[in-house]
Regions:
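Hinge/lid segment of periplasmic solute-binding proteins
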Residues: 51, 122-175, 203, 229, ...
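Short, solvent-exposed loop/beta-turn-alpha elements that line the ligand-binding surface or hinge
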Residues: 54, 108, 135-150, 193, ...
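Extracytoplasmic/periplasmic solute-binding protein
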Residues: 161-169, 174, 198-251, 295
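Glycine-centered hinge/linker elements that transmit conformational signals in sensory
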Residues: 204, 247-279, 321, 325
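C-terminal lobe and pocket-closing loops
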Residues: 304-315, 331-337, 341-442
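Conserved N-terminal structural module of periplasmic/extracytoplasmic solute-binding proteins
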Residues: 4-10, 18-133, 141-148, 190, ...
């Protein structure tokens, strides 16, 4: 899914100490600055003793590689591998198509089968660090000449207690992606970008045709993504997931704001009849329904639904609009969960492997080589009748010199999707909770499924029970230092 012009000087520092978090938090490793084993990844020092520079240690790293159906992304990654190997011939590359899974990461780490670096999300930072499954890359980060030009909002998600554990690729604020053609076909007005819950409800109800299998909106109803989708509305109503105070983490999502968000879901299902009849959809299924024209709206980071709608569903850019999340009421904030893609280095990797992984991850950052590769990719897509969908937020500041260079390339091609500036201006990202976010999502998914399946469900009772469960099973077990 993702070179730094000064990395050559990093090679002169290949003997540097690389910090990595060990299993169970790795406190000793953090104190000593060691990742276990030799602090000199090159090992043999005889070359230096003879006045000759050491040859870099030959290493093999397994990299996070796009899935088989992501043909354009694979083509871009293959080009990066070729260029990286030209500069770093001592690094062998193995492609891994394992993508991060909460259910699988523990098994992968225990069996030493996780790739040298892997993708993950903002919610996982605390979890991975506490489990000892993310290498402490602070020393590598501090040596990186462009660290101060990395988007701070994204970078800060993986900086914990002053230590760095992940590298951002791109980010998003959860949005609503809308099929304008479905609305036009039914004569339903397209709402303003500065819209509200009632505007969304009214639009979803008006465009839905249950008898034809067309929904007005498809809130996710299966997997942790169901709880994630709903949390956007919790935030918009002024609520939060947890409160951290006086050394304790307390569940607070069973608030008045939480009840309002649950009532909205109940209205979408039972009053408006605007959600899919087969509402138990995970991310892929909901986004797939959108790209196939079976729902007018879907809630997600915009890049994925846009890519599927344009490149698989055959939709035209003018018919696929990206909206901020609706405000609870007129004049309110359009808050969406802040998310994105981060890459984490495996703490089981050797120092030399961790260094090579860091070099690979950052290889194209802030470089003219990447700009050339990006333009070639856009041109190749254009020749195939495909579209390029930029991320909402990149690892760099869009207003920086480099950001302006990227935008100049985008402006040259009509097959690059253009986000509406007014919609982008209204985006208001809120980071996910610090602790046990995925567990909270899973519990809320059960509540949402009850709301969608039982018309007479006691919303307050279910919300209170969910908060009590999350508190007892997860938050009460947190020991804060």
């Amino acid at each position: 899914m993702r070179k730094w012009i000064a990395l050559a000087c990093c090679l002169a520092l290949i003997g540097m100490t690389i910090v990595a978090c060990g299993g169970g938090g790795g406190k000793a490793d953090r104190q000593t600055g060691q990742a276990g084993g030799s602090a000199s990844p090159g090992g043999n020092t005889s070359g230096a003793a003879n006045g000759q520079p050491d040859e870099p240690e030959e290493v093999t790293i397994s990299i996070y590689y796009p899935l088989p159906d992501q043909t354009e992304a694979r083509r871009l990654e293959d080009d990066k591998i070729r260029r990286f190997r030209e500069k770093y011939p001592h690094v062998n590359i193995v492609k891994s198509d394992w993508h991060y899974s909460v259910e699988e990461i523990g098994l992968k780490m225990a069996a030493n089968e996780a790739p040298t670096f892997f993708n993950t999300w903002a919610t996982e930072a605390k979890f991975l660090v506490e489990k000892g499954w993310a290498a402490d890359i602070t020393e590598l980060w501090n040596q990186y000449p462009y660290k101060d030009q990395i988007n701070p909002i994204l970078a800060n998600q993986f900086i914990i207690d002053g230590r760095v554990y992940g590298i951002p690729q791109k980010g998003y604020t959860t949005s609503v992606v809308l099929n304008k053609k479905l609305l036009d076909d039914k004569g339903v007005p397209v709402p303003d970008y500065d819209w509200t819950w009632e505007d969304m409800l009214r639009t979803a109800r008006a465009v839905a045709e249950p008898e034809k299998g067309i929904a007005g909106i498809a809130p996710m109803g299966k997997g942790n993504e169901a709880g994630w989708n709903w949390t956007n509305f919790l935030f918009e109503a002024g609520g939060d997931i947890q409160e951290v105070k006086d050394g304790k983490v307390t569940a607070v999502f069973n608030s008045e704001a939480g009840l309002k968000a649950l009532e909205l879901y109940h209205r979408l299902r039972w009053e408006a009849n605007a959600i899919p009849q087969d509402w138990a959809l995970n991310w892929g299924e909901a986004v797939g329904a959108f790209s196939q024209g079976r729902t007018a709206m879907v809630i997600a980071g915009a890049e994925g639904p846009l890519d599927q709608a344009l490149n698989q569903g055959g939709m035209l850019p003018e018919n696929v609009l990206t909206f901020p999340m609706p405000a609870y009421e007129k004049g309110g904030r359009h808050i969406g969960v802040l998310g994105g893609d981060w890459l984490v280095i495996n703490p089981n990797a050797t120092p030399a492997e961790q260094k090579a992984a860091f070099d690979y991850i950052t290889f194209d950052y802030f470089t003219d080589d990447y700009l050339e590769s990006l333009e070639r990719d856009i041109q190749a897509r254009q020749a195939e009748g495909k579209y390029f969908v930029p991320p909402q937020f990149n690892y760099f500041d869009s207003n920086s010199e480099y950001g302006r260079k990227v935008q100049a390339i985008f402006d040259k091609y009509d097959n690059v999707y253009k986000y509406d500036p007014e919609s982008t201006r209204l985006l208001d990202g809120k980071p996910e909770a610090q602790y046990h976010t995925q567990d909270y999502y899973a519990v809320m998914t059960n509540v949402i499924q009850k709301v969608f399946s039982e018309k007479d469900v006691d919303l307050k009772k279910e919300l209170d029970a969910a908060a009590a469960l999350v508190q007892a099973d997860y938050f009460d077990k947190i020991v804060l230092e």
